[in-house]
Structures are given as C-alpha cells and as structure tokens.
C-alpha cells in the first residue's frame, strides 16, 4: 500500500510558508479545525513533495513536558525563593546521570517507557551523547542495535570500523551508525561528496527514496576508489547504509 493515496488528512502542526498568495503556487482546499471548528486552508499537495514547488514546510510542535518544566521553575521560585535558569542547567550533573543509570526516568519525555528504563539500566549512560543515541535507537528497527551499542560501550565487544578514518565520525556511537548526519559526513570523507550531494543522500534515506539512493551509489563507489579505498569494503558500507535507511534518524531531532 506504500505510495498509494487512501484518503486526505491534515498534519497536526505542519505550516506552509509562502511569500505570495499561496493560491499562486499550489492548489488549496479547506478543512475544519478540530479544536475551533474554523475553516483552514490546506494544500492539495502532500507534505513530502510540497517543498519541490518552492514553498517552505515547518512543523511547529507543542510539548507538555516544556509546560511542566516551566511550572516547576515557577514553583521553586515561589516556594524556595530560588531562581533557576533552565537554559544553563548542567548537562554533566552526576545526580541526574545516576537517575538515568537506575532507570528512574518516570515522567521524563522519551525515557519513561519500561523498555527504555531497562536499557538505561544496562547501558549506564555517562555522557550526553549516550542519551542522544538511546533516544535515536529506541524505535522499531534500530532497537536491534541497542545490545551491541551497550556491549561496545562496556568493552564486551570490540569497536570496529570498516575503514579506520571512519572513527572520526563514529567514535561517539561506538562504531555504530546511528544518525543521518554521520552518513552525510562519511560520504564526504570517503567519497568526496559535496555538501549538497550529502544532503540529497540524507533526504533519500530519511524518505526511503530507493531510486535516489541507487543513483548515488555509483558516485560513492567511484569516489571511494579514487581515494584509495577497497571496492568490496565500499560496497559493504553502502549496503549497511541501505539497511540504515529504513530507520535513519537525524541527530538534531534526537537531541
């Protein structure tokens, strides 16, 4: 069924930005706002292709956790007379890491499920990078890599790189490709992809565009060979990236 349109819908937080009257650029229809009942203008083009028309799509998200933090800061000020600047909280606080190591994360956004708590107790996170990686890995597909990630962190399995220079971008994740940004950087390092080409690779992975991935492969292999890398190793790396595309996640979002 993938790729076939079954019905229409409205993204909960997707907003299209246009410098002119939007009807000069794309066809529009109307839909009812579920909260207010008001009529909204909705593009008839699907979100994945709307930017090809020259428009910008932004997702503006609300998060209840942020409201809870705001209320907590206000309560501390009211009851204790202490002013807390949430933007300067120490991300290396030992007491906080102990909570994560103990799986004491109930009420913590993205870290409160029983499964995540179990893996946190096994991982014993010691750096902010560990937490970012767990956030990215704890989803269907990449979850299979979590045991390896944990074993490599604690030295129970060796950290290996297909090509030694890949350590530059895979060191923080113990040799496992976790983020789209790592693939972007590695494509430039290994095969001299331009910034634009590496971003095209990221988009192709994020949106699972097999045709675009297939079109980029010969350039990667050719560029890698030119830089002195073994063709068979390059083929393996690309095959790993193709599997990675099924769950590719960007680091900025995980952070």
Residue ranges and their predicted role:
Residues 1-248, 254:
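Mg2+-dependent phosphoryl-transfer active-site scaffold
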């Amino acid at each position: 069924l993938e790729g076939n349109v079954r019905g229409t819908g409205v993204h909960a937080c997707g907003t299209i930005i246009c410098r002119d009257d939007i009807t000069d650029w794309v066809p529009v229809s109307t839909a009812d706002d579920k909260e207010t009942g008001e009529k909204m203008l909705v593009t008839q083009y699907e979100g994945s292709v709307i930017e090809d028309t020259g428009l910008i799509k932004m997702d503006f998200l609300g998060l209840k956790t942020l409201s809870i933090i705001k209320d907590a800061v206000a309560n501390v000020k009211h009851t204790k007379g202490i002013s807390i600047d949430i933007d300067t909280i120490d991300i290396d606080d030992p007491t906080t890491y102990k909570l994560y190591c103990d799986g004491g994360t109930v009420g913590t956004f993205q870290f409160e499920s029983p499964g995540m708590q179990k893996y946190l107790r096994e991982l014993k996170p010691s750096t902010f990078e560990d937490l970012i990686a767990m956030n990215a890995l704890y989803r269907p597909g990449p979850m299979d890599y979590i045991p390896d990630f944990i074993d490599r962190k604690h030295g129970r399995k060796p950290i290996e790189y297909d090509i030694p220079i890949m350590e530059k971008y895979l060191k923080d994740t113990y040799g496992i490709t976790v983020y789209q940004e790592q693939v972007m950087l590695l494509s430039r390092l290994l095969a001299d992809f331009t910034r634009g080409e590496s971003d095209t690779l990221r988009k192709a992975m994020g949106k699972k565009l097999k045709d675009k991935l297939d079109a980029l492969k010969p350039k990667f292999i050719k560029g890698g060979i030119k830089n002195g890398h073994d063709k068979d190793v390059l083929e393996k790396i690309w095959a790993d990236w193709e599997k990675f595309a099924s769950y590719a996640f960007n680091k900025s979002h995980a952070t």
